[in-house]
Curated annotation (Swiss-Prot):
The gene is div-1. Keywords: DNA replication, Nucleus. This is DNA polymerase alpha subunit B. One of its GO terms (cellular component) is alpha DNA polymerase:primase complex. One of its GO terms (molecular function) is DNA binding. DNA polymerase alpha:primase is a four subunit enzyme complex, which is assembled throughout the cell cycle, and consists of the two DNA polymerase subunits A and B, and the DNA primase large and small subunits. Subunit B binds to subunit A.
């Protein structure tokens, strides 16, 4: 998204001024809303925030700061609207084409307007030591900020289950250590979705969820037609969509419609003025509603029925597992040294976890170094050499490594979600036994523990789109609520339309959840967190390379500590840590 807000980056920019923004959900939600409304990024509004905080003499962002910020941004927007068209910015001097360096010619279009102040090669720090040995592109400059970072290995957050014990964690286990992929794999081809098959799959999914809702709520005896004018109460179900007559309005309470599960895909507008309970809606959500349609124009909804999460499968009680997770990018956006990944692998060699999960992007399209004229290898060769380095570094360990691409940012896969695993050519074929290549999303099982992973940022996408109304809104855990949608909707990406280009046929087939996973690794740009939700634990480690530092996650599971009792989850017997690299 062009107008994103990232709390960690925002605080990094505020830190030099001695200011900070607390990681409170309603603050984050407000700042995200301001960025989207005024078409700015988090970095764009830093100066405005600093100005407001300096004027008010405050060190920490609060509701008053945000209110004043919104007032200032609104004033700026009005000023822009009323600026006469005849007032033009003075033209900047242009550099004649013959005088432009190769660096400028190969850069962004904006670079031709800027004088070149880049450092000479002799002033650029070079990779050294094991960072040089590890880098798949030895000609990359070093990341000096990473080498000088503060608080390496600092624990950002910890969750310790009430029955977790360190004792016996490294002991032998009788359970099967084989990783079994239980989710479907998308096609390596794309663009061949048949409309009739997609419609049939959507209709079947709506019917399945409606059946689960009906089983959970005895008052729903039968489904009716909500488009027929009547004073009688009707129960119906369907998919939440943005009212097509209000496309110019932001998705919300007054721009919601329901697409009915009939042959015509009938759309009925919904009015929630009679609703007294909490409302949570997003496009693509499948719900049931109760209401009346006296005029035939819109359904006056007085109750919403949400499906419950699927049950969690049992696990083997003698299981001990150390699972690590990291999400790309794995190097800074202006180099190709992969120092962050090298450092992580050094820790893996030292501590030897059972599983290391690495989610993309590996070759990031946002990496500006890949556009430099000095970068003279193909993206595929860069990926191949990087994964070979990963394999070589972990020789002698028993750590199983899982590799997952990111369709929206990895340059070595088609930009279509769900994403098939990286294609293995001759180089990668040599290491297919050492590295496990999986799709995005993927669910696998080991010793009965079901683990889901995705790099597509569904929770971030829901955060950008979801409408929620509650009398107790400030005291509700927003991230937990967003995470719960994946479980109740039985889908690893329940938002429709998606924020990433998608194959609807594969999405409906591959993203389905047959049971609630015990663990879900779903990184986002939101603040790092670990949340227990509906019998599962959602872990957001953020990214491994983020400015001068980054984060990764460790999870230790010890079911030798006792037998899993009814109502308990794997999280009760686990310790989760999110650490800085």
């Amino acid at each position: 998204m062009a107008y994103e807000f990232d709390l960690e980056d925002f605080n990094d920019n505020l830190e030099p001024f001695g200011f900070n923004c607390p990681a409170k959900d309603h603050f984050i939600e407000k700042l995200e809303g301001l960025c989207k409304t005024f078409r700015k990024s988090g970095e764009d509004i830093v100066d405005d925030v600093v100005s407001v905080m300096s004027n008010l003499g405050q060190k920490s962002v609060d509701s008053g700061i945000l209110a004043k910020l919104e007032e200032n941004l609104e004033a700026q927007a009005q000023k822009t609207v009323h600026t006469p068209r005849s007032v033009k910015k003075p033209a900047r001097g242009r550099v004649p084409l013959a005088e432009k360096s190769g660096f400028i010619l190969s850069g962004d279009p904006d670079d031709i307007e800027k004088p070149s102040h880049h450092l000479t090669n002799s002033a650029i720090a070079k990779l050294e030591g094991h960072f040089l040995d590890f880098s798949p592109f030895p000609g990359s400059p070093a990341n000096e900020k990473f080498l000088k970072r503060a608080d390496p290995s600092h624990v950002v957050t910890t969750i310790r289950g009430k029955k977790y014990q360190d004792k016996g964690l490294k002991g032998s286990t009788k359970s099967d250590d084989t990783i079994r992929i239980i989710s479907k794999t998308p096609s390596t081809l794309y663009g061949g979705d048949k409309s009739s098959m997609v419609i049939e799959a959507k209709a079947q999914r709506m019917a399945d969820i409606a059946h689960r809702i009906q089983k959970s709520f005895e008052e729903i005896v039968d489904w009716g037609n909500p488009s027929i004018p009547s004073v009688d109460v009707v129960y119906t179900y369907g998919q939440v969509i943005h009212d097509e007559t209000k496309d110019n309005e932001k998705f919300g309470e007054h721009s919601v419609a329901l697409m009915i599960n009939d042959e015509d895909g009938t759309m009925i507008r919904m009015d929630f003025s009679k609703m007294t309970e909490d409302i949570t809606l997003f496009p693509g959500q499948i719900i049931a509603v109760r209401g009346t349609n006296e005029t035939g124009e819109e359904l006056q909804v007085d109750k919403i029925f949400q499906p419950a999460a699927l049950p969690v499968n049992p696990v083997e009680t003698d299981t001990t597992k150390e699972i690590w997770f990291a999400c790309g990018p794995y190097t800074a956006t202006d180099n190709c040294g992969y120092e962050h990944l090298c450092e992580l692998l050094d820790k893996v060699v030292a501590e030897k976890p059972d599983i290391l999960m690495l989610a993309g992007p590996f070759v990031d399209k946002k990496n500006t170094f890949l556009n430099k004229p000095t970068f003279n290898i193909t993206y595929d060769n860069l990926l191949e050499d990087l994964l070979l380095k990963v394999k070589e570094t972990l020789v002698g360990t028993k750590t199983q490594v899982i590799i997952q691409p990111n369709a929206s940012r990895d340059l070595c896969v088609p930009p279509v979600f769900p994403s098939a695993p990286f294609q293995q050519n001759r180089k990668l074929d040599k290491i297919k036994k050492e590295l496990i290549f999986v799709a995005d999303p993927c669910i696998f099982r080991i010793s009965g523990v079901e683990v889901a992973m995705t790099s597509s940022e569904p929770i971030q996408a829901l955060s950008n789109t979801e409408f929620h109304r509650s009398a107790n809104q400030e005291n509700i855990d927003r991230v937990a609520r967003l995470s719960s949608h994946l479980l109740t909707q039985q889908c690893m990406y329940p938002l429709e339309p998606t924020e990433v280009p998608a194959s609807m046929g594969d999405l409906l087939d591959v993203c389905c959840i047959g049971s609630t996973p015990h663990i879900v690794f779903a990184p986002t740009k939101l603040a790092p967190s670990a949340k227990c939700v509906n019998g599962s634990v959602f872990i957001n480690s953020s990214t491994l390379a983020k400015g001068p530092t980054g984060n990764y996650a460790k999870m230790s599971i010890n079911l030798n500590a006792g037998e899993l009792m009814p109502g308990e989850t794997v999280a009760d017997y686990a310790q989760i840590q999110i650490l800085k690299i």
